[in-house]
UniProtKB/Swiss-Prot annotation:
Job description of the protein: Has hemolytic activity and also inhibits the growth of gonococci.
GO CC, any one term: extracellular region
Stated family: Belongs to the staphylococcal hemolytic protein family.
Modification type N-formylmethionine: residues: 1
Keywords: Antibiotic, Antimicrobial, Cytolysis, Formylation, Hemolysis, Secreted, Toxin, Virulence
Pfam families associated with the record: PSMbeta
Subcellular location: Secreted
Natural source organism: Staphylococcus haemolyticus
One GO BP: defense response to bacterium
Name of the featured protein: Antibacterial protein 2
One Gene Ontology term of the molecular function aspect: toxin activity
Key word Metal-binding present: no
Length: 44
């Protein structure tokens, strides 16, 4: 869950700084880490 929180923080900071490339990669990190956490929960 820490990775998701860090990715959200990075996305917020990138949005505030109008760093669109970092914002895009942060959003992908959120999705990727979310899928990883769900996989752990459901045992995939």
């Amino acid at each position: 869950m820490e990775k998701i929180a860090n990715a959200v923080k990075s996305a917020i900071e990138a949005g505030q700084n109008q760093d669109w490339t970092k914002l895009g990669t942060s959003i992908l990190d959120i999705v990727s880490n979310g899928v990883t956490e769900l996989s752990k929960i459901f045992g995939f």
